[in-house]
Amino acid sequence: MVHDWWNAFVEGFTRTPPLSLPAAEVAWLLAAAAALCLVPVLWRFFGRFVTIVHELGHAFAGLATGMRVTGITLRRDQGGTTLGVGRGRAVWFGFWGYPAPAAVGVGFVAASMQGWGRAALSATVVVLVLTFLFIRNLQGVFILLGAIVAVGVLVVAVPSEVQGHLTLAAGLALILGAVRDWWNLVSVHTTRRRELGSSDAFILARRTGVPAPVWLGSFAAVIGLCAAGAWLALRVAL
């Protein structure tokens, strides 16, 4: 059985025929993505995956600029923290949290449309396993393990002809999840100001002197560009 799982995982890195979807099927996939972000019981779990991508956005941005990532914590309330040290660009590190799910989402959408949806899922498993090296709390271990199992099941147990559709739905859900998290961040700056200390926009404003609304707008702009990119990729299949 393990041998079969391994073969399925390795075969996941091969290309399949590009997706060609009727508009009705795209609508169903979009509805499924919206359900992951709007139905409370589904968001309770999918939101934690969005948080993982958020924190990995910080981590990859830091590593790309020469910082050393010292740890990632994940919490059941969908909170998280990524710490890094070094001479890297702290502003770049701090920026790429909220836009990260949307950036990964448009990547998933584009990959699925070009026949690389199952490869995106297999690559996600690899990234999640490597993330264990940086997790620094027990809750984070269980949250990450749950994500690995969930994506792993999609890789080894779902027929290859369906994996591209699931990757597309996951990509759309990540973009919608980024929008939901951004809106939640806006509420921190308007009606829940007691939580300002945990806001990436607030932290960036303190570091740079650039007002927090500018950072909120910048997050929204990147998320919007990713959504537009996903729409353009989808139009190829319509």
Label every PLM stretch briefly.
Residues 40-90:
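Small-residue-rich helix-interface/hinge motifs
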